[in-house]
Amino acid sequence: MRGIVFIGTSQYDVLGLFLKEIIKGFEINGCEILTIDRANENYMDLLAQALTGEYEYDFIFDINGILMGHDRLYTFFKQKYVAFLVDHPMYHHKRLMRQHKPYYVTTIDKDHIDYLKKYYPHLDRIKFVPHGGIGQDRIEEYKNRKIDVLFLGSYENPKKKLEYTERIPNGMRELIVDTCKILETKTQWTMEQALLYQLEMRQLKMTNSDMSEIMSDLVFIDEYIRAYYRDKVIRTLGENGVTVEVYGNGWEEFDGNQTDFIHIHESVSYMESLELMGQAKIVLNVMPWFKKGSHERVFTTMMNGALCMTDRSEYLEEVFTDKKELVFYDLKEVEKLPGLIQEYLNQNEKAKEIALAGKEKSEADHTWKKRGQELLDWIVEES
């Protein structure tokens, strides 16, 4: 088995790091990989030579279907194309509409399987493959960790974000705002469910083709609900006297008055974020809107020896046990989160036990290398 893996660009090269670990998984299972990195100024020439020359390959692999974004390049693909999505499919609508055969897609949320089948029926194979995590060789012992609570992630002010909709024509603005507001309370609904509900209330019927376009056009809703809960969680902690070290872009827009407790730092590189996790007792996670999926931050937190405290997803509840390998909190009961955090800060040995169990479980089952092995097994099975 031979494959071509294309490494694109991303903020802090984070996707490149994930891909390099996935490649190790491919190679462990005996697959020969030709890697083409966009960081190489001659990457297009190398790609063209590989696709049109005598190099024999069985599949092409990349993250988020990036190569499908080239208008003509995909027409030269001679074998199966595998796109590993790390976001909701609506962010990659135009790429997913390409008609290459065979076209394989993996997704990080089980809800997205039904979404892809419904709106992109031309896709040949679809599989749920969750994120993985990355650890370090050396991490600090739990009792010696200097950071009590760590939060990593960017910030957008949800109030200001919603004000942006005032520029939008009235009917569409009401649809967007009403969908955002229903997701604030229906925390287990997907964006698609909420939007379909609002369309039904307006007696508007959409074809699947129209709906996939609308979802792609209204990613604002997904961005808003992520921003809303990120703000709510951090604000609630500050108001209740929980000290949090926050790293990420945009937090200068946070208008809370809890500067004694919410300590805002500049954004850091991905590798620096791993070092911070290795110095933290608790790493707080607010899931992207993946109701049956995963996020790499959960696994990476565990692999770096911190206690992961995260809101729930159906998948995470399937693979981890609450208060054994991680600690869940509920978006509907964010007011209980300060007490939950304080409970584990006060019980150092209990927190350490959960952190170690999570580390062991994630290192065994949830590395990016492991995902590479799972992916290759699937590609071979479907050949």
Identify the role of each PLM range:
Residues 4-11, 17-30, 34-39, 98-99, ...:
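Catalytic binding pocket for nucleotide-activated donors in carbohydrate/polymer assembly enzymes
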Residues 58-61, 80, 104, 282:
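Structural motif
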Residues 93-106, 119:
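A conserved, positively charged/aromatic
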